[in-house]
């Protein structure tokens, strides 16, 4: 209790603090572009940026420039999350949070589904082709076609697109990716 002295007045401000332990565990992961339909990852520079992690229709995390995400605190239980990327084919991930933090590791994703349908077709190619051969700063450069983020839309990026060209994604499974 604070008391007044030497002509000063004192005011008591009641405060509360919740010092109970956290009720959940962090869940982390990294989203990378798939290199092919076999499920091979394209590599560490092919990160999927600004990919939302959605649980129960709520965005709980978003990937950063390194493709990494952190869901800060989930209580123990089973979860189904959707990786939702504006130019990719959505992926569902199921995981169980137990009594410690959980790292989901590297998760592959198809990143060249520009029109968000279940096909990698001429509509997607038109988006890629419009940016092909360009570099950052040029009017026709599209950063979403620069899959490895090196500032150029070139053969490295085309190899990734062409691996999925013509794919009917409605029958594609992320099971082993």
Describe the role of every protein-language-model region.
Residues 1-2, 83:
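Hydrophobic/tyrosine-rich beta-strand signature of extracellular beta-sandwich/beta-rich modules
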């Amino acid at each position: 209790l604070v008391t007044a002295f030497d002509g000063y007045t004192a005011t008591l401000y009641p405060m509360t603090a919740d010092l109970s332990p956290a009720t959940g565990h962090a869940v982390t992961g990294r989203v990378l572009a798939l290199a092919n339909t076999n499920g091979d990852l394209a590599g560490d520079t092919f990160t999927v940026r600004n990919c939302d992690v959605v649980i129960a229709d709520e965005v709980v995390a978003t990937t950063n420039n390194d493709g990494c995400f952190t869901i800060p605190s989930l209580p123990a239980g089973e979860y189904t999350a959707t990786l939702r990327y504006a130019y990719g084919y959505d992926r569902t991930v199921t995981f169980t949070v137990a009594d410690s933090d959980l790292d989901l590791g590297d998760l592959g994703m198809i990143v060249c589904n520009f029109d968000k349908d279940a096909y990698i077709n001429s509509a997607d190619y038109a988006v890629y082709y419009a940016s092909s051969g360009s570099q950052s700063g040029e009017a026709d450069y599209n950063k979403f076609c620069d899959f490895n983020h090196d500032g150029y839309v070139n053969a490295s990026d085309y190899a990734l697109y062409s691996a999925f060209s013509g794919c009917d994604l409605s029958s594609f499974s992320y099971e082993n990716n």
